[in-house]
A protein has these predicted regions:
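Short aromatic-glycine-enriched beta-strand elements
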Residues: 49-59
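Short nucleic-acid-contacting surface segments enriched for D/E, G, S/T with interspersed K/R
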Residues: 81-96
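Conserved hydrophobic positions within beta-strands
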Residues: 41-43
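Short, structured beta-strand/loop micro-motifs enriched in basic residues and often containing a Trp
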Residues: 73-81
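Bacterial N-terminal signal peptides
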Residues: 6-19
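Short boundary/loop segments of OB/S1/cold-shock single-stranded nucleic-acid-binding domains
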Residues: 22-37
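OB-fold/S1-family single-stranded nucleic acid-binding modules
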Residues: 102-125
Length: 125
């Protein structure tokens, strides 16, 4: 009986280990989630892939210099459930986003909301 109990405890604990690493993977602690950054830019790359979509946009800074921003988004299945389609965003499109910038203030964001040019703002996370 003790042998079976030991195995049961072992398998329960082993089941919890992957769950903790999955939660760590989905942490957004590297983003400043208490504030939004507003960006407008032209899409230079778009990756509709699991586990996260990625959009790269070229944004003009205050001096008119182009900088590239990396925008991390939700997974394709999540976005499809929210009404997004893969072809709603394409390279060359101008988009407007509200996102949570990286805490180190580099050019990266966790997408919150996206507005295609001439479209309606919708959640992207």
């Amino acid at each position: 009986m003790m042998f079976i109990l030991n195995y049961a405890v072992f398998f329960i604990l082993m089941g919890l280990v992957p769950a903790s690493s999955v939660q760590a993977h989905h942490s957004h602690s590297n983003y400043a989630t208490t504030e939004y950054t507003h960006l407008e830019g032209k899409v230079t790359e778009f990756h509709w892939i699991n586990p996260h979509t990625w959009i790269y946009i070229e944004v003009l800074d205050d001096q008119g210099k182009a900088t590239v921003w990396a925008l991390e988004g939700a997974s394709p299945p999540e976005l499809r459930r929210d009404g997004w389609r893969r072809d709603d965003v394409e390279v060359g499109d101008t988009i407007f986003v509200r996102c949570h910038q990286l805490k180190d203030r580099s050019n990266g964001c966790l997408l919150g909301f996206l507005t295609p040019e001439g479209g309606v703002e919708k959640e992207w996370d």
